Amino acid sequence: MKSTSKIYTDKDSNLDVIKGKRIAVLGYGSQGRAWAQNLRDSGLNVVVGLEREGKSWELAKSDGIIPLHTKDAVKDADIIVFLVPDMVQRTLWLESVQPYMKKGADLVFAHGFNIHYKLIEPPKDSDVYMIAPKGPGPTVREYYKAGGGVPALVAIQQDVSGTALQKALAIAKGIGATRAGVIPTTFKEETETDLFGEQVILVGGIMELMKAAFETLVEEGYQPEVAYFETINELKMLVDLVYEKGITGMVKAVSDTAKYGGMTVGKFVINEDVRKRMKEALQRIKSGKFAEEWVEEYGRGMPTVVNGLSQVQNSLEEKIGNQLKDLIQKGKPKKS
């Protein structure tokens, strides 16, 4: 098992490395808004690049950030930060960034997908690096304002200047990540592990596990409302325990009956066949097959995603969950 021996913090980073440089943040969604505001509040020169004037444009202005059309934002930028969705980045790069960017400008990413799978091929004279916060944009902003920060990953793809790591850590400091800690990785490792996590547990795995457990109980004649509470609703409480106290803390917090049942039946359900399928899923990611299929799917208007989402929305568990929302919310304590 490989492990990093280095975690970068505030003492390893210096904002002076990028002071005076113009930073163009492309996109003003969840991450873009948080990054732009945090970098601005850290005393850095930030503009936002958007493809069109609309809600994001007006929101940036109301936040005190200068919005520009992407072409105008990148032409004078020393550092260009891609914070638009993965599948938008290649078109944005080809049409609005590459033809207009300044020679030698840095390219920064929050996810390695487009670089790792060569959907974007950067100029040879640009530093290319990644800062990947391990939390959603609103949390990145909230923690920064409170004096904290969300941990992040850092990776260097091209280091033409010899100072790419220093600049990457300065960006990380600017968004507050070095207050917590920044772990070195590679574009390859970040991309493959991120996709794997999404597919086998965070989205795909947990969704299918909840669905299978719920449907098993209902098919055996149990009330769907009771099945929903036992297989879906209670998951949040346990995930919160894992987040706060780790897996050991979660196991210690549940009943002895739950401990025994979980430790015996858990391995029966998540068996070697499941682990084998996980490795197969990982190989699809590593080989580039998943990326190839996803690019094709996106180009066709995402029919698999649209159809799958429709099935989820029309499922019994979703209907029961919607019916129980009022009941669940009713029991929550009122905020003072």
Swiss-Prot record:
Catalytic residues (UniProt): H111
EC number: 1.1.1.86
Domain KARI N-terminal Rossmann: 5-185
Pathway(s) this gene product operates in, as recorded in its UniProt entry: Amino-acid biosynthesis; L-isoleucine biosynthesis; L-isoleucine from 2-oxobutanoate: step 2/4; Amino-acid biosynthesis; L-valine biosynthesis; L-valine from pyruvate: step 2/4
Residues reported to bind NADP(+): Y28, G29, S30, Q31, S56, D86, M87, V88, Q89, G137
Name of the top EC class for this enzyme: oxidoreductase
Catalysed reactions, semicolon-separated: (2R)-2,3-dihydroxy-3-methylbutanoate + NADP(+) = (2S)-2-acetolactate + NADPH + H(+); (2R,3R)-2,3-dihydroxy-3-methylpentanoate + NADP(+) = (S)-2-ethyl-2-hydroxy-3-oxobutanoate + NADPH + H(+)
List of residues binding substrate: S255
InterPro entries listed in its UniProt record: 6-PGluconate_DH-like_C_sf (IPR008927), KARI (IPR013023), KARI_C (IPR000506), KARI_N (IPR013116), KARI_prok (IPR014359), NAD(P)-bd_dom_sf (IPR036291)
Segments crossing the lipid bilayer: none
Any one GO molecular function term: magnesium ion binding
Entry binding sites for Mg(2+) 2: D194, E230, E234
Cofactor binding notes: Binds 2 magnesium ions per subunit.
Highest taxon in the source lineage: Archaea
Cofactor(s) for this UniProt protein: Mg(2+)
Residues the entry annotates as binding Mg(2+) 1: D194, E198
Pfam families: KARI_C (PF01450), KARI_N (PF07991)
Keywords: Amino-acid biosynthesis, Branched-chain amino acid biosynthesis, Magnesium, Metal-binding, NADP, Oxidoreductase
UniProt-listed GO biological process terms: isoleucine biosynthetic process; L-valine biosynthetic process
Gene3D superfamilies, per the entry: 6.10.240.10, NAD(P)-binding Rossmann-like Domain
Name of the protein in question: Ketol-acid reductoisomerase (NADP(+))
